[in-house]
Amino acid sequence: MAHFAELDKNNVVLRVCVVDNKHVPSDKHVDGETWCTNFWGGTWKQTSYNNKSRGEFASTGWLWEPTKEKFYVAKPSGHDSWTLEETDSKLTWQPPVDWFNTEDCKLADNSDVKITINTWNESAQTWKGQHHKTEANGNLTITNFTWNKSTKVWDRD
């Protein structure tokens, strides 16, 4: 079985369909794309779970980049400063401040903390994080942090 993504005029994926291999005999994307166009109409591009030559497996709402011949997810809302970059043969949105390891983080006082929730703050151009801890009495304590891009440690808010 082969998978093909239908594209609109703006290269947005409308749907992904499965096509029997008997309709795509040569295992070349052009044959299958032509078959889909002849059968359903529209513009089609092959996508694959197994072969990542076209980036990630396409999903509805994703985009097709014709110059790179890759599918990629649309830019997340509220992430205007992020740029599309090709990494590990796929297209991904990258923040202007490097990602960090949330499992083994240092605070400004050099103590360790595990950040369990983190989000991008576009207006501050940095990461916001939270550490959740359940106390012995069952109460939940939430501590808020801001990533300090200069020192590369978490500052308590």
Report the location of each language-model feature:
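Interaction-interface detector
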Residues: 1-157
